[in-house]
């Protein structure tokens, strides 16, 4: 009996200390885990904020440079009274003289062109560094859109397109309705390449009269290349999508154009949630649930945050 009482007495004295010690250890571990999580969240938030600001700044510069250059060209065409009815030769000469200086300084300049209120069109398309194709429609081409192999009129033709009217194109009609500098929606060019593009648009005025639209293309392939370079510098996946959650450009490999899926018919741009990159796909799926106005959110890919 005395031995049992001694054991019980020891247990009664030691057990509270053991339980208190274990509770303190667990409490300290919980506090440390909480502090670690908070530190990780704070560092992640700061890094994400830095990446977002840096990428936004670079993206703004990428788009602003052709946007403002296009306005400058539009102003000069109107100021120097270069437009003539059914004859865009003077605008052609001006665009040709400006193409190399602007193209060398703004690599994302893919096409620069002018569409007139009477259906004329002239443009230069960059096929390679300092190599351009002239695209022309006026009285000299019998009102057909002729695409040449070089930057000047000659007998070396790439293609001829009948019944081309720039006034009904997605880059002309929005400016005709609201004459102000703006970006076009994403659309497909009507040349022989039929590439998907985004265009900077500016109205052209001559003696305060609206005479046409100056257009500068940023092709989506060029946009993708820019985002791919950003990914290498920033170590972050980047993508741009429209209000319908369809991809405009992304930093990974592959086209944004669908070859045919249950959600995206052939020729349509893919949904961001259909991208083969699991990080982009997971992020896009979260945006589908929370909407485009959400700020910061967390996703998991292969059990990694």
Label the predicted regions.
Residues 7-15, 21-110, 181, 197:
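Juxtamembrane extracytoplasmic/periplasmic/luminal helical "stalk" adjacent to the first N-terminal
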Residues 1-6:
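Short, Lys/Arg-rich, polar N-terminal cytosolic tail immediately upstream
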Residues 153-159, 163, 167-168, 179-182, ...:
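Intrinsic low-complexity, intrinsically disordered coil/linker regions enriched in small/polar
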Residues 210-211:
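Glycine-rich acetyl-CoA-binding "A-motif" of GNAT/NAT acetyltransferases
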Residues 32, 214-216:
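Sensory beta-strand/linker motifs that couple input domains to effectors
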Residues 65-182, 227-230:
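Extracytoplasmic/periplasmic sensory segments of membrane signal-transduction proteins
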